């Protein structure tokens, strides 16, 4: 019968080397370009009647957490998003609203080509100079407005981590003992608890006759 040490052996081969553990569990294939930024700590406990998996996910909304079991592998993944203050949110909105639209980019195709200006260069050179001057003035005004809207907050310490997280747990050696229909999850105070009950009765052995 498999013990808790069997699944812990596949979970972490060296508890004293977190870097190697992260590199092993967070490695992705070439086709998957998702970068794992956070390796949340995990506790796994096997009791007489259930398997308990606890994962610390402080500062993460339950809407940003995904849990699934595929090919005997339990996967906990999601994203810890950075909270923006009102001033930073306003900057994001302004940048998105001032970005060039497709209609603006398409209108450049209707602008006259340089060959059309060659027929009458002198009169249009003055107009061109005036346009450049006006554009320069408008650009300076835009830069002044951007400087006014830049956040004035100064961050002295930044130790919190944000981004994607992912943890794997290989249940192959104990899966036959578990009742997957009894999976229960609870997320409270930043702690995700997954409970899987053991099967009440193992099936009786089946005798096979030889013909």
Curated annotation (Swiss-Prot):
SUPFAM superfamilies: HSP20-like chaperones (SSF49764). Disulfide bonds: none annotated. Keywords: Stress response. Residues 89-105, 124-139 have a biased composition (Low complexity). It comes from the Eukaryota. Residues 140-152 have a biased composition (Basic and acidic residues). Residues 89-152 are annotated as: Disordered. Residues 33-211 form the sHSP domain. Coiled coil: none annotated. Belongs to the small heat shock protein (HSP20) family. This is Small heat shock protein hspG8. It comes from Dictyostelium discoideum (Social amoeba). The gene is hspG8.
